[in-house]
């Protein structure tokens, strides 16, 4: 069947009560042997495949709506619809259905689903086929009419009969004439009755009645009737809003009068459904299903008509990107596209795909790049909404555009950088726009939705692009607010508080929390790229500065970032953390928190508990050797005692292993392992790295002679003990809380591996009896291995170095207290 009369779209209703487009084809009615009855067949116009094969069941309720729709249910939750291109085709198929069921084609519902008791009640009546007799349409009869309309809503058959009577007698237009009379006479009682009548007619759920009620001639009077809700002391002013406040603007003149009328109608009907009608109860939900379908098919038609008019869309894009276009006009154009994209969400996947491809072909992304950088907040907000539709539809399309753009533009004008800058510069105190943009960025950098083919790998290409061109823009606020210049300036001012660097501004803290959330996502999903970036920028150290923030949510974000890194159980990260002494700000935060049992306390404890349970040996050794004296007084959890136990067990195992190996073999093994690790780390850091800035942990330089490395464990321990005897001369200070306090100091030389006496953290302690000690010297707590001979700098944890560290004798210290 090739004629357009039988051309249809097949729809099914999904679980969300939205219509899914199953394809376009041609419908026919024929006898199907397998189904043993007359059936509706729809074959796809593209390849002739069978889209629908449905037997015309004598007991199925079919409905004809809007002259071109036939809707029915084949199972409890399986609704079908055929949308015809022409009314004639719909009428032909409707007659076939009615013929099979033995029904009159003039009736637009062939069956009613009623329960047995109601069916028995109607069977007892002598005549059930006659129409309901409507009272005369007069002012004096309004109460009677209202009672009639309200009474039929519980009966499907009576609803159908009333709808047919209203349609045949042109009753609705007569009622609306009475409405005008009641308003002129200020007849409040009559207006209240008309509200009940019109609301009840809407609940009849009849498409043919909607066509009358929502026509240009009637719709404003229908809205007027719905203003007079008896439950309200004063009537609403919906008509005033629709005629005066809500202005229809044609950004480009629409020459098609049918399209213009359809847009007006859809807006007003949507307003009735969303604003005027009360939220339906659970018993009324299905009463307005046809109204939902009416709006849905209107939107599909509007989008299709606009999409087919390429001249119209081309003109819109031309004006949107034209520098001569004034701001007001551009605002209208952007708002038009926002509404256009919102309407497109009613389309089914294949149609939506064609829609967005049309927009991409016309240049929607370059246009968005221009308008997102404008000063007008409303324009930027609308552009962000459009961008979100595009990212949701196809993140790959957006990624492809920005990578092509990078070959022709500077970093500052790249679309993704414009998006990041809009996120950073959001003026909303609650950062609503920034949160939305952060979600879009996360979608774009999510490897899970990146394509991988034999010819190219989108993941590799895009992540290289992002880290080379965009990451510095994203982290700029974080690095600025945790800069060492700020730290040094605050120290010069003599501030001894723990909040010298972190921003007190709530909005800035929120922004940094968003950035940290995105960086935490990168740690989980980007592996090599983010690892290289963290090492190069010493990013974790900068993030942990935020542990001092007065905003607990920001401190928790910083802690979560570190927790994700540790959760990877990657020894590169572990060495970076131990060599940088990066547990210090976390432990300081725990001690500063005192005895308060809150989220921060629990999160810090969980971090150390994870290390204990997962038995991460390098971190366990570092924590016990450097911080156990400060933590041993915390007895309300067994985490730290458990870490000490793990540490001692590992130490015993290493000692037993060491004692079982001859001295000469131990010496050779030390030398070989150090060299192997040294080469491995050099290879890793020499991989492709276009990032700016110096590596935080530089490759270990080859020693001039490997013989400079201690020949045995015993020789190295002599050096360590000599250092210990010097440290014992230093007296510890008292922290303000009465316990241990670590000062979080850092210098570039520390991160780059150069020897510095002040590059490590210090711990201070005193007792109440010695609180007025005149002076005290700082003492190093860090135990990174530093060779005393030659030029070898121990920036890498060699496996057997732990054995040496574990036998180090720490000077006795007093037990810290969490609060005094």
Curated annotation (Swiss-Prot):
InterPro entries: ARM-like, ARM-type_fold, EVH1_PP4R3, P4R3-like_central_dom, PH-like_dom_sf, PP4R3-like. The keyword Phosphoprotein applies. Pfam families: EVH1_PP4R3, PP4R3. Residues 744-789 have a biased composition (Polar residues). GO terms for molecular function: protein phosphatase regulator activity. Residues 798-809 have a biased composition (Acidic residues). One of its GO terms (cellular component) is nuclear speck. Serine/threonine-protein phosphatase 4 (PP4) occurs in different assemblies of the catalytic and one or more regulatory subunits. Component of the PP4 complex PPP4C-PPP4R2-PPP4R3B. Belongs to the SMEK family. This is Serine/threonine-protein phosphatase 4 regulatory subunit 3B. The lineage of its organism: Eukaryota, Metazoa, Chordata, Craniata, Vertebrata. The gene is Ppp4r3b.
